[in-house]
């Protein structure tokens, strides 16, 4: 859904306004999309109808921060919108965003595999995420698409990502870390 905001921004830049959407309108649209996504997952997307409203510290063993659902939503919105805009701000020069996103996606793919396997999750003291294999397939598709894109985005660039791609990729990274309960790992992996 972040793709629509990015596409509209790119469309405005090409046709009407050279600046595109204002930052406030982008953030407002991202907040609305995040709220709708959170509501949809909370209402329809869960197998056992329970959500763990905790934040897991990836550095300290068995370290959980329990928060209220409202604060959890604010935290989720911060993670998704923050990662989306961080990728958008990074996108600029030839291949500048594709390479790091490939590295971060590979890192998240490995962590997702480990959290989706009961033995590895228990051994490494990770939060077990049942049915994480679907996320692995999605991340593998993103990595493959980015490798293909990087070929044409490297100097001299023939294709540019624009806000359509960068907002989407950042949103994907934010949602993946939320689904695998490794929200605090994203800044570490992206650094």
Positions of the model-derived regions?
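Interfacial loop-to-helix junctions that mark the boundaries of transmembrane helices
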Residues: 20-24, 62-68, 125-135
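Alpha-helical transmembrane segments
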Residues: 1-4, 37, 43-44, 49-56, ...
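Interfacial loop/helix-cap signal at membrane boundaries in integral membrane proteins
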Residues: 50-68
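Glycine-rich adenosyl-nucleotide cofactor-binding module
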Residues: 63-81
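Carboxylate/His-rich catalytic cores and anion/metal-binding grooves
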Residues: 28-39
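Membrane-interfacial loop-to-helix junctions in multi-pass inner-membrane proteins
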Residues: 15-29
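Alpha-helical transmembrane segments within multi-pass membrane transporters and channels
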Residues: 4-12, 16
């Amino acid at each position: 859904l972040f793709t629509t905001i990015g596409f509209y921004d790119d469309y405005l830049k090409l046709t009407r306004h050279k600046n595109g959407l204002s930052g406030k309108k982008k953030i407002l649209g991202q907040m609305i999309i995040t709220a709708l996504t959170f509501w949809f997952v909370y209402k329809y997307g869960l197998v056992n109808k329970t959500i763990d409203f905790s934040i897991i510290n990836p550095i300290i063993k068995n370290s959980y921060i329990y928060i209220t659902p409202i604060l959890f939503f604010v935290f989720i919105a911060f993670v998704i919108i923050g990662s989306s805009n961080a990728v958008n701000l990074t996108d600029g020069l030839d291949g500048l965003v594709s390479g790091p996103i490939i590295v971060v996606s590979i890192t998240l793919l490995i962590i997702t595999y480990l959290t989706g396997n009961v033995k590895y999750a228990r051994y490494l003291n990770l939060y077990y995420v049942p049915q994480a294999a679907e996320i692995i397939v999605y991340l593998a598709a993103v990595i493959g698409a980015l490798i293909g894109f990087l070929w044409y985005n490297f100097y001299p660039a023939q294709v540019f990502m624009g806000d359509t791609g960068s907002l989407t990729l950042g949103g994907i990274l934010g949602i993946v870390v939320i689904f695998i309960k490794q929200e605090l790992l994203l800044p570490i992996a992206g650094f």
